[in-house]
């Protein structure tokens, strides 16, 4: 999806693609352009900005490698699977003078703009997300995979600091939480 979007932006050039699955990289390149890099090292030498859309458990190591090479990063959410890893990436980006942006795409959903126009000084917001089990992002639970969007939107709408959150999650289909509730 990232390659498709970049290919539609006039001011962006999709220069290179790297995927550990070379066939997937070839398919993306044939659809949207860009050179297929044979290694991550070759890829890093070709680009200025990188989209990281890998399993969350790899974000810190990949992010640190890219930031140490002074590459700007759009990293899929969540930024990391622990707050320590997230803070390490934020600190390194600042130290290197690089942009580190987390892909909270729901912030740019036109529906959110409509909600903002109608919602002035909210006192209570309740969000429910019901969906079939996605069979994706198996290295993290539903909170970091999907609920993070809902929490980010609520924080954006409320525009105040969090005082407290009460939450519970349970594993049902996997070893990580599949069902979660936060208040």
Tell me what each language-model feature is.
Residues 38-41, 129, 170:
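Conserved SAM/SAH-binding loop
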